[in-house]
Amino acid sequence: MGISRRPKGNNNASAAESAPSGKPNIQKAQFDTTKKKEVGVSDLTLISKVSNEAINENLKKRFDNREIYTYIGHVLVSVNPFRDLGIYTDAVLDSYKGKNRLEMPPHVFAVAESAYYNMNGYKDNQCVIISGESGAGKTEAAKRIMQYIANVSGGSNSSIQEIKDMVLATNPLLESFGNAKTLRNNNSSRFGKYLQLQFNAQGEPVGADITNYLLEKTRVVTQIKDERNFHIFYQFTKGASQAYRENFGIQQPSQYLYTSKAGCFDVDGIDDLAEYQDTLNAMKIIGLSQAEQDEIFRMLAAILWTGNIQFREDEDGYAAVVDQSVVDFLAYLLDCDAGHVIQAITIRILTPRNGEVIESPANVPQALATRDALAKAIYNNLFDWIVERVNKSLTARSATSNSIGILDIYGFEIFEKNSFEQLCINYVNEKLQQIFIQLTLKTEQEEYAREQIQWTPIKYFDNKIVCDLIESMRPPGIFSAMKDATKTAHADPAACDRTFMQAISGMSNPHLTPRQGNFIVKHYAGDVSYTVEGITDKNKDQLLKGLLNLFGQSKNQFIHELFPHQVDQDNRKQPPSAGDKIKASANDLVATLMKATPSYIRTIKPNENKSPTEYNEKNVLHQVKYLGLQENVRIRRAGFAYRQTFDKFVERFYLLSPKTSYAGDYIWTGDSKTGAMQILKDTNIPVEEYQMGVTKAFIKAPETLFALEHMRDRYWHNMAARIQRVWRAFLQIRIEAATRIQRMFRKKREGKEFLELREKGHQVLQGRKERRRYSLLGSRRFMGDYLGIAATTGPGSKIRGSINLPANEATIFSCRGEILETKFGRSSKLSPRIFIMTKAKFYIVSQQLVNKQVQIAVEKAIPLGAIKFVSISTCRDDWFSLGVGSPQEADPLLTCVFKTELFTHMQGAMPGGGFNLKIGDSIEYAKKPNKMQLIKVVKDSQQAQDHYKSATIHTQAGEPPTSRSKPLPKGKPVAPKPFTSGRLIKPGGPGGRPSKLTNGNRPTPKPVPSPAAARPVPTPAAAAMPIPAPIPAANPIAASIPVHTRNPSLQSAQSTRAVPPPPPPAPPAPPPAPASKEPQYRVLYEFAGQSANEFSLKQGEIVTVLQKETNGWWLTKNVRGQGWAPTAYLEEVAPPPPPPIASRPTPPPPPGPPKMNGANGAAVRSKPTPPAPPAKRPVAGRKPAPPPAPRDSGMSISSNGSGNNSGRSTPTPSLAGGLAEALRARQSAMQGNAKKEDEDDW
């Protein structure tokens, strides 16, 4: 499909950028006051030296400058700022919509935009893996991703908006039940969460699903000093309603053992009361009924009261309850018998291998352990129920097409005492690190080798050996050893621990070191020492049968939902251990993540004090090392940013090549690999930017991929623009055709009204008054309001405002005229006036000059009904009188060139039709009140105009009184104006080809300059005559109003020709050749590039610097290619001095006076000869230098000497470009005038 030419004047910058061969539409640069200067590098792949220390230094620079995000290719590194930087506002969010990651600074919104765009564009499931240690900001990053996707995913449907609100409401709800304050983080996630957002084919969210992992249920019963239990307990005890306090016995957190044991009740930056309200609001949004909320808080109260049960030793050494009332209230909350509660806690049911059931009284430590197990079981199952209930509300409303997963799981943990919980957490983090290695390091390099891509292998640490150490079955790993030890000595926890330690000591693994009472595992994040004591008992994860019996005896239906399984007293089969469960969950999570396209966010904790200004370089360096950022940078710098199979690549980008697509249809008949190569060729992608593998196409730089995506996005816009352009042209043609028809119709209709009014004028005069020849012209029309008094703008509106003409009086006639003023002791005198007639009155308006300012005032306002008669003569004069008969004032005697039209309008506006027109040999009027006088009108052929003297008016003889107006003259025939000229359709036509009807596109032959010897010498032109300056008007209003006077009869002034101006000065010397804008540098030392993007240099050669960076590397270029080179190896070469400028020739002497030709006195001079072109043609692409003294002489080079240009002078073209340039300028001016004439209406 051919590229259509856009019409002129369409400033579509994006379309211009999308055309590979088009010139970019560069807009005016503006200073951006919001953009900060970049500190360090925003992408670590651009760092000058690849090392852990250099990465740490760059992160520190950016952290100190409030820049917390940095890229490693498509991986985002985030440093926790421990403060609000104001970078998550709606304005910031909107700025990342539809932008690729290179268009905007690094941000978590850019990762979310990329995941959402790729899901819609490629129809692949996406996932965002957020990793890092506890307190590094993983939960905050997950919330911001959810915020962005909910904002950009669109959808105005109420169900879609409901899903968005529910997804966002899961954050405060699950945080209150699953987060807690630790020594390292005030809002630490004590559970893992994988949120999967489900979308339909249009990219709208229709559902979601949450999977939780590894809830730290031991925190319910014990916390170390200065830590807290889960947030919900403090929210509930501080903010519970009065009904909850009365029904559930809720008191302050200091009254419960589980919330007061660590001695921390309040946390800086956390408002428990406000967050409690947020939790209740989230429950309502998700759809939890009030009954369900009541049951949830009943279980929380039961857990709190369970912790307050205390035991003492009885006389037999067994456990006995200290306060029976606490047990009674707990039984009330669990809706069961208090005796069953005491029996479940103080009596242990054992089932040996022989099948005998033994009930053994528990001592105080055993009873406390059973009590805590009861509380942990209730909270763990309550949390699972809440997650299931949320998933029920988030069930997909319609069919799902793709999904975006967000993994937020607590990070790597190392404490002074690490047990089973830390082993499980660190194991899951090892699995996530293994995914990262598999997808970014190992799999990538294996794929390069498999696809036969040129590649230099990079060494990295594969943590699979650590994962096998923990989860392997053969040879037995740590989880298998725990399970075997439990089978061997399941009744004695201490014996189980000893058996497990013996198994650990027998293992042979370089990443495992046994010690006395503990063992050390060398994780990817560091060495961790795990305590063996109690580790096997935690691995059992068994709820005692006595507690299960207690839950079964409860009458509360909600408890049966929390513990749905019935107790089988005869089942002695060992249930799955906690290690088995977490291993199965971790493997399921890995399988889910491997099915999606991952995006990575690596979070870093800058210090252990939660300080917004402290940056602990030692701790951050450790995190940089175990996160493998250095290896990631090396692979990203040498790798390929994008790879796709040939089939999918062609399916995605076939629109970009005319050989693979036509009008959106796929027309390629060859194989996919050849088609992919054809697409890259037609889009002008350099061969260095991609490689073709066996089954996939590999693109090196992400900028190349973004360019392809941009061109694909603009394809449909460009096609739509073509259709719209043709459709708009068609509509414009119809509109223009209709406009022409309407214009002609209105012209005929309005002209008919004016002609009818003119015919009425003949009837008003009754055929008794001689007519002026100009009054009978066929083009004469009765326009009425000649001064524009009824207009809203212009000088007429200013007159209307000056005389305060009422808005309800419509002006039907206005013009300028004169009135005869009679003064005592002096002869009568004509004075100018303004006549305005409305449907009610006739106004005589005077203008007087007071203090050099014109004052406009109403001199007389005569009601039309007060006019008894109008007196005129039978001659062709313009005089008439208004017979008012006022006893105080004389009748006005007026003269007006539009008298007949005035009488016609007056007859139509006169109330009751009482218009009395007296026509006689003299004009009758009251010169003084009640004193009539006659003004004689005589014919005098010597008077060119009407002349008044001594009560007599002298005028010439006119046309016969019975004369009629001549017919309307026919217009001058003109050729019909085509629709493809002027502004209707731009040059190029709607189809992109030159229009056949326009003359502007015809090729013009270029003038060939003649030899210098054959060129005639130009003749000096006559000097221009000085033009007197016009006299300024006294007032702009008066100057802008037309004066209605008769032209001198049969007299005309002889037109004089304007004297042509002198020739322009001699052209200046041609400008020197432009120096190179790009600086040149000489190579001082030999430099051998170490990577693909480093440019090898040879000593002494000259290179051009294309881009300068502050990190010590510049982008250089020469004939061999381009690449990055160290700045210390280069020295700038001074540019050569410009050549000397030749002196300008002396201008010619002033010309003499022009020769006069005979009687008419017209100036005659010979035809000027074009001046000689400059000696050297100006450099292409540069403007010719203008003459030193610009003048507007009003002449053209091809002029014939006439200066009459109807008031418009053509600007003098510059002669510095020679004859050819002058002729081209003249031709452009002529074409411009012709175009303007074509655009004029009929």
Curated annotation (Swiss-Prot):
Record bears the keyword Repeat: yes
GO biological process, one term: actin cortical patch assembly
Location relative to the cell: Cytoplasm, Cytoskeleton, Actin patch
Polar residues bias spans: 1047-1057
GO cellular component, one term: medial cortex
IQ domain residues: 717-737, 738-763
Start and end residues of each Myosin motor domain: 39-713
Record's keyword terms, sorted: Actin-binding, ATP-binding, Cytoplasm, Cytoskeleton, Hydrolase, Motor protein, Myosin, Nucleotide-binding, Repeat, SH3 domain
Main location: cytoplasm
GO MF: actin filament binding; Arp2/3 complex binding; ATP binding; hydrolase activity; microfilament motor activity
Occurrences of domain SH3 (ranges): 1076-1135
Region entry Actin-binding, spans: 586-608
Gene3D superfamilies: 1.10.10.820, 1.20.5.4820, 1.20.58.530, Kinesin motor domain, Myosin VI head, motor domain, U50 subdomain, SH3 Domains
Biased composition range(s): Pro residues: 1059-1074, 1134-1154
TH1 domain boundaries: 771-961
Bias-annotated ranges (Low complexity): 10-21, 1011-1020, 1191-1226
Chain residue ranges for the region called Disordered: 1-26, 945-1020, 1047-1082, 1130-1242
Domain notes: The myosin motor domain displays actin-stimulated ATPase activity and generates a mechanochemical force. The tail domain participates in molecular interactions that specify the role of the motor domain. It is composed of several tail homology (TH) domains, namely a putative phospholipid-binding myosin tail domain (also named TH1), an Ala- and Pro-rich domain (TH2), followed by an SH3 domain and a C-terminal acidic domain (TH3).
Family: Belongs to the TRAFAC class myosin-kinesin ATPase superfamily. Myosin family.
Function: Type-I myosin implicated in the organization of the actin cytoskeleton. Required for proper actin cytoskeleton polarization. At the cell cortex, assembles in patch-like structures together with proteins from the actin-polymerizing machinery and promotes actin assembly. Functions as actin nucleation-promoting factor (NPF) for the Arp2/3 complex.
Protein name listed in UniProt: Myosin-1
Native species: Botryotinia fuckeliana (strain B05.10) (Noble rot fungus)
